[in-house]
Amino acid sequence: MAMWRPSDNKVYLPPTPVSKVVATDTYVKRTSIFYHAGSSRLLAVGHPYYSVSKSGTKTNIPKVSAYQYRVFRVRLPDPNKFGLPDPSFYNPDQERLVWACVGLEVGRGQPLGAGLSGHPLFNRLDDTEVSNLAGNNVIEDSRDNISVDCKQTQLCIVGCAPALGEHWTKGAVCKSTPGNTGDCPPLALVNTPIEDGDMVDTGFGAMDFKLLQESKAEVPLDIVQSTCKYPDYLKMSADAYGDSMWFYLRREQLFARHYFNRAGNVGEAIPTDLYWKGGNGRDPPPSSVYVATPSGSMITSEAQLFNKPYWLQRAQGHNNGICWGNQVFVTVVDTTRSTNMTINAAKSTLTKYDAREINQYLRHVEEYELQFVFQLCKITLTAEVMAYLHNMNNTLLDDWNIGLSPPVATSLEDKYRYIKSTAITCQREQPPAEKQDPLAKYKFWEVNLQDSFSADLDQFPLGRKFLMQLGPRPPRPKASVSASKRRAAPTSSSSSPAKRKKR
């Protein structure tokens, strides 16, 4: 007899619904008011490989390299406290104003050039490209003076939050599997904000060289005790709000120039089933830890990303260029202007060339200029919008002087009558805590544009380019010479347009 049985398959319940993230264009209303803001010439001078401390403790000369991130934190004025020409176009009781970035140009000075980086004691054993004999005679110290032209990178990331970087560092060892001294440490991928002065990937990997390379001889001097970070494009693109990256520009190129192997013991030996044992000094085989020195190849002005305007029509995330917190973060890398200037000074008056009497120095210079076009926008303070903004960033409503009512207390509270009496516990109210900058512990290049806004767009290069994008505009009416001078009445000899048509 046939019998019905319920299905043995598992029943999958739908996931718990989550709050939907909406684009800023759904609750931000854009106006027809635009402003231009630009920085002054931004300069940096320092040593390209390391910082120099002449007094022993204080850094006299900072490290300034073309392979460093330049992270500009651009401060904008509060539009709700801004002197507007016509403040009647919005209601401050029901609306708030915000800035939207619609145009940007990063200007770069200085000529194109390739700067070298290297190490006078670089760990290279053999030239594995043209080696004539594979030997295993490893001496105590085979380091050599090697210089390279590193990977070529042009990068620009724009957002209202710091860009996020990723790198590999030493991970934690499980207690159940303790390691021995000299074992390869476990690796862990970590995310940290990209700060001004952090090193970019130069072709040797995004990793913490200070923790993962104890020999101090595997990479050039400028990164041997540093951490090279690479922008985490995947995580920033997947960000729910898209504040850290509205858009980005990227161009990278390199090729392998020289091929070496490393001196030292091979910690993980080659399995014996991968080769036949040989003689004449080939057993055991030489080091199989290979490394290639990178080269950024040719630098040309035809492949430049800077010194040209970019217009933001649609961001890659939900934040379409709205400057929350009245700030913009611009993360820049440009290694096409990496020339290191050689400067020398004689220790005494020279009568002939003597290298022993000449001190040699290295300096690298950076030159930037930032220009923006901002659009004034309005947000209507409805209950739904305020609740959404509070969940997104709870400091926004505080900055707008909008407070949330605390819940009504359901328990019985104590209230003393004589609050100044010394017979009871101190009833003095604690002063409100000062507002702390959540990004104060990070290093950025501060650029203050609070006094640099101008509505006369045609007076600035980027403003004129922006007006050209809008199309031709009607000419301004000419001012009359005299207010009392009236237009002359038509004479009998002059014919009206209607009469001309009849003729």
Swiss-Prot record:
For the keyword Disulfide bond, the answer is: yes
**Key words, A-Z:** Capsid protein, Disulfide bond, Host nucleus, Host-virus interaction, Late protein, T=7 icosahedral capsid protein, Viral attachment to host cell, Viral penetration into host cytoplasm, Virion, Virus endocytosis by host, Virus entry into host cell
Q: Give the UniProt entry's GO cellular component terms.
A: host cell nucleus; T=7 icosahedral viral capsid
Q: Where is this region: Disordered?
A: 468-503
User: Which InterPro entries does the entry link to?
Assistant: Capsid_L1_Papillomavir, Capsid_L1_sf_Papillomavir, dsDNA_vir_gr_I_capsid
Any one GO molecular function term: structural molecule activity
Q: Does the record's keyword annotation contain Disulfide bond?
A: yes
Q: Which GO terms describe its biological process?
A: endocytosis involved in viral entry into host cell; virion attachment to host cell
Task: Report the subcellular localization.
Answer: Virion; Host nucleus
Composition-biased stretches, type Low complexity, lie in 478-497
Family per similarity comment: Belongs to the papillomaviridae L1 protein family.
Alphabetical list of HAMAP family matching this protein: PPV_L1
Tell me, in a sentence or two, what this protein's role is. Answer: Forms an icosahedral capsid with a T=7 symmetry and a 50 nm diameter. The capsid is composed of 72 pentamers linked to each other by disulfide bonds and associated with L2 proteins. Binds to heparan sulfate proteoglycans on cell surface of basal layer keratinocytes to provide initial virion attachment. This binding mediates a conformational change in the virus capsid that facilitates efficient infection. The virion enters the host cell via endocytosis. During virus trafficking, L1 protein dissociates from the viral DNA and the genomic DNA is released to the host nucleus.
Complex formation: Self-assembles into homopentamers. The capsid has an icosahedral symmetry and consists of 72 capsomers, with each capsomer being a pentamer of L1. Interacts with the minor capsid protein L2; this interaction is necessary for viral genome encapsidation. Interacts with protein E2; this interaction enhances E2-dependent replication and transcription activation.
User: What name does UniProt use for this protein?
Assistant: Major capsid protein L1
Annotated source species: Human papillomavirus 66
